[in-house]
Regions:
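Repeated loop/turn-to-beta-strand initiation elements of outer-membrane beta-barrel proteins
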Residues: 83-86, 141-144, 196-199, 257-260, ...
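Outer-membrane beta-barrel "beta-signal"
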Residues: 170, 356, 466-480
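Detector for outer-membrane/organellar transmembrane beta-barrel domains
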Residues: 265-267, 311-328, 332-419
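Outer membrane beta-barrel
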Residues: 80-220, 447-453
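Residues that define the transmembrane beta-barrel architecture of outer-membrane proteins
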Residues: 54, 65-71, 126-131, 140, ...
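Residues on the lipid-exposed face of transmembrane beta-strands in outer-membrane beta-barrel proteins
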Residues: 50, 73-79, 132-137, 188-192, ...
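Transmembrane beta-strands of outer-membrane beta-barrel pores
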Residues: 50-56, 81-83, 92-96, 139-141, ...
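Transmembrane beta-strand segments of Gram-negative outer membrane beta-barrel proteins
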Residues: 34-61, 67, 84-88
Length: 480
């Protein structure tokens, strides 16, 4: 009941911010007295999208194959000038879970009504989120933003080791649109523009944890190669306080034609430590192990590079932490008793991603071909440098993506492949679309996932646990 009362209050506060705070700062640039905005004080754009997801597993009825029917509306609203404005980018979702029984959680956004710290309001069948919603004030020398923000730190296309602030929405693992994967964080950011470099500083006063697929969801992870069932506990945000705030800085420059950035961060780790906490013994349920997603503070130093060379754009990111937490490894097959909860220790840690974009000159081979043909490839690896630590699950990935369009841009095609080498598994994701060039477009894609388990009581590739989740996805999209 309290949270249901908070929701209108949150929306009301944003309305007051929009109506009253903005006029106080929406002045023309004090340096020259002229606005640089030629499109008027209010701009509004966005899209509406219908998404339908079907499980492609054989030997099931059509009703069982239908997993999700969802309507999404995304809006981008800006009021003000280039120098001083309010920017809002809300996402509104409505899914078929509204009409399903409470016992069917396959595509539910949340078990119950909830208001998150970043103003994401969700229930079983609907969700409203504000990934970006901030007040902007600046000029040619500097700018300041206050509100929900997403930070595009890093240069890699798939995995970004130096993107520290924005946690991931993993309710559909990687199989969401790019603009849905990162959660906005309430923060204050400032950027100063110097002649040869740019400095950005960020403060996030409250912790925003990532989101995982909960029990009963289509993309829930079933660790079915363990002798005892694994049950995941709920995710909890860290308490308020300066000790759980995040701070970061980034210096960017161009040196000899290469874009270079150096960054530093201290605050809550956006990656969870999956801590085996205790044995669960409940009446009528099998004995199982409770795993709790925990968040700990972490420090990072990072660098990223981007270099254009003929038809190639090369990218690299590197992040190092002296104090990233993980659990001490225990071997269930050693014959020694397992001690719960597992011990959590600090460790030196390194993560890097290297890759390139190749703009293929397809017009040289296909007469009249228009548009960009791009091949993107990337290698991603993480390591704990101290021995006896539990090894990272998301590591040793090769990704490849091919994108092109035909018939004057009406038919876009793409194929993405992500391969896990350390824990064998892969996903292949071909897509084809048609652009009616009147605002409407449609896409059809297929997800094929597979992997293998090499031993009991070991964590395998994510794709192994989703081996029965081959899916067909159809979308109808309208831009306005």
């Amino acid at each position: 009941m309290i949270k249901k009362r908070i929701a209108p209050l949150v929306l009301g506060l944003w309305a007051l911010l929009f109506l009253f705070t903005f006029p106080a700062i929406a002045e023309d640039d004090p340096e020259d007295g002229k606005s640089t905005n030629d499109s008027g004080p209010l701009t509004f754009e966005g899209f509406l999208e219908m998404e339908n997801l079907f499980n492609a597993h054989k030997d099931q009825s059509f009703d069982d194959a239908v997993i999700k029917n969802e309507i999404r509306g995304k809006f981008k609203i800006r009021y003000g000038t280039d120098n001083a404005h309010v920017f809002l980018s809300p996402d509104l979702y409505l899914s078929s879970a509204v009409f399903q029984s409470e016992s069917d959680k396959t595509c539910a956004y949340n078990d119950d009504f909830d208001v998150a710290r970043n103003m994401r309001i969700s229930d079983r069948g609907y969700e409203a989120s504000l990934s970006e919603g901030y007040v902007h004030y600046g000029n040619s020398r500097a700018r300041v933003r206050v509100g929900n923000q997403i930070y595009g730190w890093g240069t890699a296309d798939v995995f970004n080791p130096t993107s520290y602030f924005n946690p991931y929405d993993m309710r559909e693992t990687f199989f969401k649109d790019d603009d849905e994967l990162k959660l906005g964080v309430p923060s204050i950011s400032g950027m100063a523009f110097f002649e040869k470099f740019t400095v950005e500083m960020v403060i996030v006063p409250v912790h925003i944890p990532g989101i995982l697929a909960e029990d009963g969801r289509y993309w829930e992870i079933h660790l079915d190669n363990y002798q005892l069932p694994i049950v995941f506990d709920d995710v909890h945000a860290l308490s308020g306080g300066i000790e759980n705030s995040a701070f970061g800085a980034r210096v960017s420059s161009t040196i000899l034609g290469t874009d270079v950035s150096v960054s530093a961060y201290h605050g809550p780790d956006k990656d969870f430590v999956y801590l085996p906490s205790r044995i669960l013994v409940e009446p009528g349920e099998p004995v199982s192990v409770l795993v709790t997603p925990k968040t700990y503070p972490v420090s990072f130093l990072g660098m990223d590079f981007s270099k254009s060379l003929d038809s190639f754009v090369f990218q690299a990111e590197l992040a190092y932490s002296p104090d990233k937490r993980t659990t001490l490894a225990q071997n269930p097959d050693s014959g020694e008793p397992i001690v719960f909860p597992y011990t959590v220790e600090r460790s030196d840690y390194i993560a890097y991603a290297v890759g390139f974009n190749y703009f293929i000159p397809m017009h040289e081979w296909i007469e009249g071909h228009e548009g960009d043909t791009v091949l993107t490839m990337e290698w991603y690896q993480t390591r704990f440098l101290n021995r006896s630590r539990t090894e990272p699950v998301i590591t040793d990935f090769i990704s490849a993506r091919f994108e092109d369009s035909y018939f004057k841009g009406r038919v876009p095609v793409a194929c993405t492949c992500l391969v896990s080498l350390k824990n064998p598994g892969y996903v292949i994701w071909p897509r084809i679309g048609y652009d009616f060039q009147n605002g409407f477009s449609t896409t059809l894609s297929y997800l094929h996932l597979d992997g293998r388990s090499e031993a009991l009581n070991t964590t395998e590739s994510l794709f192994y646990y989703f081996r029965n989740n081959d899916s067909l996805i159809w979308k109808l999209h309208y831009d306005f």
